[in-house]
Amino acid sequence: MLVADLHHFLDLPDDIPGPARRLAEHLSSIVRAATGGDAGTAWMSALPCRRRPGNRSCPGRMVVLRPEPASVIHWECSTCHDEGVISNWGDSPDDLRRRKLTVAGALNEIDLTDAVASALRDLRLLDTDSERVVFAVRADGERIVLTATDDELDQLIGLVAAEANHETNRRRQPRLDAAFDALSVAHAAGG
């Protein structure tokens, strides 16, 4: 079991070794998923497991639990059962909890591929509300499901389009285009 204090992984120096940086990114993603999704119940996020048993990627997904009132975040891989807790995450840059009440609208469920979900998590220009939608993406059996209102989906599509239009990396451009196409087609079809 990994016991981590998130504050130890914030503001890391540029020369930090790769494994430590990847662990920090993994813990950051877990906190974002746990705070972007429901509190009080364990749910399976679309975040992949980072372990490589036998030099092969673990096919598992991160199951996260954020108790209410806020304390430590529990996480566990659905396949290899790698697990841990993260403390001191409240009010960090990775804390995506809503700060005020919002009006709930009708939700659309959109099926995504692993590649599209990964591209959405890698977006750099997301506001907090869109980041919450992206990190609350769930794995449901073989499906990966993004749940969003029409307004949230419009906002996310606009942000993906803006980033895709300004992307100079030729490897990243097709991933952003695929994410834009998947969201646009699903939105046009009504979710």
Locations of regions flagged by a protein language model:
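Short Cys/His-rich zinc-binding micro-motifs
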Residues: 56-58
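Short linear motifs in intrinsically disordered
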Residues: 36-40, 63-68, 123-127
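Acidic, aromatic-enriched beta-alpha/helix-loop junctions
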Residues: 46-48, 65, 142-145
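Short, compact, well-ordered microdomains
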Residues: 60-96, 163-182
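Short, intrinsically disordered terminal segments enriched in charged and Pro/Gly residues
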Residues: 1-45, 89-100
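Positively charged, low-complexity terminal tracts
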Residues: 96-191
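Flanking scaffold residues of small Cys/His-coordinated metal-binding clusters
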Residues: 41-50, 71-72
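Short cysteine-rich clusters marking metal-coordination/redox-active sites
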Residues: 46-53, 77-80
